[in-house]
Amino acid sequence: AIYRRRLKWLLAVGLLHGTLLWFGDILTAYALTGFWLLRRAGESWPEIRQSVKFTVLVNVGLLLLMAIIMATLTNMEDYGAETAAEALLANDISTNGGWTEVTKARIDDFGANLSGFLLFGPRIALLFLLGVTAVHLGWLTHPERHRALWRRILLAGVFVALPLNVWWGYEALSWALEPEMDSRSVHMASLVLELAGPALAAAYVAVFMLTGERIT
């Protein structure tokens, strides 16, 4: 009951945040995924493991689908011009528009963001399930027993995931400053970020696990 109330509160805050402050709100997606995970409470470890395997397959399929969609869009002659025009219009509204115009645009963008939940929702579900797995296997509760694992995760994050995240940041900033430029590279970086982002987050967790181990 407490967890359900917290999810409802998170959903309410996410909806307000997405419509009034930032259309890229992630709290709503977290809440919706949390309700899905709540239905799996009490499952046995074999059932959870099957859910993890299924969610991995779904995410692999979605990643391939996104790659095909991006390749198709970026090869369209007028796609770059349309994308640049949309970015310039959004920038004009956010900097010169009144409160009503900005709010309307933000609500429209938030609705479009939520419509993509079927694409990024499974990724969040997989991360949640990996958290459950990490607790069940003792990776989080007994990190001292899994030093080698956390060190490998940290090394992968620093030497692989971090450079890829920096590359995405560079491409995203370049495209934001010059939206009329070719968007192929930023879309490629965004696709890579689907894997590099969670990998870097896992490296952050590894830092806490290894540091906390030394403190205790």
Question: Where do the protein language model's features map onto the residues?
Answer:
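Hydrophobic alpha-helical transmembrane segments of multi-pass membrane proteins
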Residues: T19, F23, L114-A125, L191-A199
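Transmembrane alpha-helix/helix-exit interface in multi-pass inner-membrane proteins
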Residues: A161-W175, A199-A201
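Internal alpha-helical transmembrane segments
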Residues: I2-I68
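Alpha-helical transmembrane segments of multi-pass integral membrane proteins
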Residues: E180-T216
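Alpha-helical transmembrane segments of multi-pass membrane proteins
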Residues: Y30-F35, A125-F128, L195-A206
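Structural signal for the C-terminal ends of transmembrane alpha-helices
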Residues: R39-W45, V132-P143, F208-T216
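Long hydrophobic alpha-helical segments that form multi-pass transmembrane helix bundles
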Residues: F54-V132
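Interfacial segments of alpha-helical transmembrane regions
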Residues: R49-F54, T141-V160
